[in-house]
Amino acid sequence: MQGGNSGVRKREEEGDGAGAVAAPPAIDFPAEGPDPEYDESDVPAEIQVLKEPLQQPTFPFAVANQLLLVSLLEHLSHVHEPNPLRSRQVFKLLCQTFIKMGLLSSFTCSDEFSSLRLHHNRAITHLMRSAKERVRQDPCEDISRIQKIRSREVALEAQTSRYLNEFEELAILGKGGYGRVYKVRNKLDGQYYAIKKILIKGATKTVCMKVLREVKVLAGLQHPNIVGYHTAWIEHVHVIQPRADRAAIELPSLEVLSDQEEDREQCGVKNDESSSSSIIFAEPTPEKEKRFGESDTENQNNKSVKYTTNLVIRESGELESTLELQENGLAGLSASSIVEQQLPLRRNSHLEESFTSTEESSEENVNFLGQTEAQYHLMLHIQMQLCELSLWDWIVERNKRGREYVDESACPYVMANVATKIFQELVEGVFYIHNMGIVHRDLKPRNIFLHGPDQQVKIGDFGLACTDILQKNTDWTNRNGKRTPTHTSRVGTCLYASPEQLEGSEYDAKSDMYSLGVVLLELFQPFGTEMERAEVLTGLRTGQLPESLRKRCPVQAKYIQHLTRRNSSQRPSAIQLLQSELFQNSGNVNLTLQMKIIEQEKEIAELKKQLNLLSQDKGVRDDGKDGGVG
């Protein structure tokens, strides 16, 4: 009865006018909570349950979609206005109109994406031609004809790639978690360069803006001890996208073990973006302890590579196999290079298997057993100065020469003057990038190069300096929203990374100084085996130094300990190092004096030349005066 009265009272409240006074409820109902969750397991995928009132639809920002729309506008402008200047004006006007309508962002209409729009325009033209051909054909046409058209569309992407059109890929120089570096030859000028390719996943506006900003920062680095920058551009690439409704087929693909992964495996760190502060060393093999640097040489001679099952192929009829590119006349590209350039591989942790094979059998193992879908991602290409000799190679060669010396107290093969010159140029380069507000975060001998006959130091591989492009856990802002050089992500190579990097705490430019301390030790302390090197470099974290180094190089040993202090605030800065006694010892003073003497001799010779010219001019004038008097 009470429930019926409450229902009557509720109806009276709903139907009563403004002057009615609402009576208190007879039952105290609990406060309203969130809407109940409904079981949607039996709802077809094409039907979506409406949980909220209808709202005005919004247009989510998708860079790939907006770039395609901008390319369509530019294509239409060229079709309807043959004059290039007027076509450009029409295109700008259309972009402004779409921006005002909220359909486009001004960001996607910028000139930085002109190469991508050119790629789209060519693909659109080819697509229109293919569509016309398809309409003119018999509707009952064989499916092989459609597959050939699709294969040509994929081939078109390779033909419109600036990287494939302008450069000949010769060798891979290095690979890490942030991209691969290739040695290439420019087809026009015949010169050799290094090109780094970085796959940008999830191309949002924020990510693209960071990429462009960081590229401009790297382009502004002009210093004798920094690897030279030439240009950069962005291209579209296919990325394998597995279908969830098909059975997975594993595909082994060629993958060279990177330098960073090798160092991580030595330290017992898993191959991911984070590293651990606990370092575990592998036991030496019972046959013999591996010599320092021998692993690289043996791998190169035997062409031993590492295969990783990191690609998932699922059966579908959506895309033609990229191996057909080779059959359709793309000469000069191996199967592995086509897969790498056109279909950057997508790692699947559940199917990851590793096995060792040889390079000759790579093409036999790369087989597309099924068909796949593809997603478009952006690939950043950075063209740089080619430096093939790294400081790591130099140290390995020096250590090989030094094994014939038994007396460690002498160590003539260390070449103190050369090592000091290398370290001084390295510190000058680090001082420059720190003044530019950049923290390298991965300084190690493999990322330091010696260029030219005078072996000038060049700092390269700024991949980790741009980690905030690809990593979400990097903190570049403070509470005021201003950019600061303080970071919290665990990046770097474990033997050279500072304690704060390995612990994942905040770090700054002083982390690079720790890495410099480790490099300084390697320059003045030779190692016979890799195990010995790992033990000594790890001992730096507790202040341990080889006694032979303390006796031979007391000044260097002193600054190695200063640079590798656990408290980052107690480490010297780059400018403090340059002004220290480290570069003011007797050997350096003699070298500096010799350089000054050479410069003074050149200056004296130039002055003598000028005096001779002046005396000749004076003699000519005197002869003229004498002739006039006569």
UniProtKB/Swiss-Prot annotation:
HRM repeats lie at residues 410-415, 552-557. ATP binds at residues 173-181, 196. GO terms for molecular function: ATP binding; eukaryotic translation initiation factor 2alpha kinase activity; heme binding; protein homodimerization activity; protein serine kinase activity. The keyword Nucleotide-binding applies. PROSITE patterns: PROTEIN_KINASE_ATP, PROTEIN_KINASE_DOM, PROTEIN_KINASE_ST. Activated by autophosphorylation; phosphorylated predominantly on serine and threonine residues, but also on tyrosine residues. Autophosphorylation at Thr-488 is required for kinase activation. The active autophosphorylated form apparently is largely refractory to cellular heme fluctuations. Ubiquitinated and degraded by the SIFI complex once the mitochondrial stress has been resolved, thereby providing stress response silencing. Within the SIFI complex, UBR4 initiates ubiquitin chain that are further elongated or branched by KCMF1. In normal conditions, the protein kinase activity is inhibited; inhibition is relieved by various stress conditions. Inhibited by heme: in presence of heme, forms a disulfide-linked inactive homodimer. Heme depletion relieves inhibition and stimulates kinase activity by autophosphorylation. Inhibited by the heme metabolites biliverdin and bilirubin. Induced by oxidative stress generated by arsenite treatment. Binding of nitric oxide (NO) to the heme iron in the N-terminal heme-binding domain activates the kinase activity, while binding of carbon monoxide (CO) suppresses kinase activity. Keywords: ATP-binding, Disulfide bond, Kinase, Nucleotide-binding, Phosphoprotein, Protein synthesis inhibitor, Repeat, Serine/threonine-protein kinase, Transferase, Ubl conjugation. The keyword Flavoprotein does not apply. The active site is at residue 442. Residues 167-583 form the Protein kinase domain. Its EC number is 2.7.11.1. It comes from the Eukaryota. The record marks 80 as: Heme-binding. SUPFAM superfamilies: Protein kinase-like (PK-like). It is linked to Leukoencephalopathy, motor delay, spasticity, and dysarthria syndrome: A disorder characterized by delayed motor development, speech delay with dysarthria, hypertonia, progressive spasticity, hyperreflexia, and bradykinesia. Cognition is normal. Patients manifest anxiety and attention deficit-hyperactivity disorder. Synthesized in an inactive form that binds to the N-terminal domain of CDC37. Has to be associated with a multiprotein complex containing Hsp90, CDC37 and PPP5C for maturation and activation by autophosphorylation. The phosphatase PPP5C modulates this activation. Homodimer; homodimerizes in presence of heme, forming a disulfide-linked inactive homodimer. Interacts with DELE1; binds both to full-length DELE1 and processed form of DELE1 (S-DELE1) in response to stress, leading to activate its protein kinase activity and trigger the integrated stress response (ISR). This is Eukaryotic translation initiation factor 2-alpha kinase 1.
